[in-house]
Amino acid sequence: MRKRRHPLRRLLSHLKHHQFTVILASLCSILNKFWDLAPPILIGMAIDVVVQREESFLANYGYPDPNEQFLILVGITVIIWVLESLFEYWWGILWRNLAQTAQHELRIDTYNHIQNLEMQWFSEQSTGGLMSILNDDVNQLERFLDQGANDLLQLATTITVVGGIMFILAPEVALLAVIPVPIIVIGSFIFQRRIGVRYKKVREEVGELNSLLNNNLQGITTIKSFTAEDRESERVNFASQSYRNANRDAIRLSASFVPLIRMAILFAFTANMLVGGWMALDGELDVGAYAIIVFITQRLLWPLTRLGQTFDLYQRAMASTTRVLDLVDTEI
């Protein structure tokens, strides 16, 4: 039996004719985050000018006058903010348009494929389950492409850029900041695997519920003829309760993730502030560099609190991808 491909690879393969758009949107997401990380560095450089004056970082490049240095910083700030805004606009346009296009194409491709299947196949399926895939699952993929893909790319960019800056400025302090990162990332993947099973159960339960509701509404005349309202109400209540319980199981695990991450972040941030402060007091670290480290540590660590939500969206999308593309791959 051939090994099953990962849902993300299957999705990218299905969107291969949009490869240029995916690459361009990814590049805009990365560059937007790159410029977004510049303000803490500019703040540190401004503090460096105030403290060091003619001996500041900018003074070493031929600008000894502090007033001139501030004008240069203001000019750089304006350019960076304009670039950040432009790339944010571009990634928003590209990812959202791609999400809408992919949603449309997947829905049409899936419907056209279903339409060509044999009648015997339809007798083995529920209308509600098929509607759930064509509507709910396709919409879930649209939500991931609209925001989740950008979030994952920007998180990876943040870790790479901020980690590099911190190791350049103060390797000892940087180590304290990055210690929790592997723990958080490994924990996230463990979380991803566990939550994935629960979200698959959620998708199955909503399919069953939709199927029951659809069949009952279509057969409402029969239900009334046999005065079976109470029995059918109980069946709907049971299916809805099963769906709610499946969601509760997923929510219980999902809700515990962010508080655990915050504790790991607390260790890194306080250790950075303390050790970096001692080094600055002892003259081992410039005040401007210390300011950059304190500010940029937050930019590295706080986005990790959203890692659970991002993986949550990702895992829901992968569960939906499996259901949609399994349907598309059904042999005619």
Task: Map each language-model feature to its residues.
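Loop segments that connect adjacent transmembrane helices in multi-pass transporters
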Residues: 125-128, 201-249
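Transmembrane helices of ABC transporter permease
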Residues: 21-31, 150-201, 272-285, 302
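Hydrophobic alpha-helical membrane-associated segments
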Residues: 31-35, 39, 75-99, 161, ...
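Alpha-helical segments in transporter systems
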Residues: 9-12, 20-45, 73, 77, ...
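Cytosolic ends of transmembrane helices, especially the final helix of ABC transmembrane type-1 domains
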Residues: 228, 252, 269, 300-327
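Transmembrane helix-loop-helix hairpins at lipid-water interfaces of multipass membrane proteins
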Residues: 22-87, 167-172, 283-287
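Juxtamembrane loop-to-helix connectors within ABC transporter transmembrane domains
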Residues: 6-7, 15, 47, 91, ...
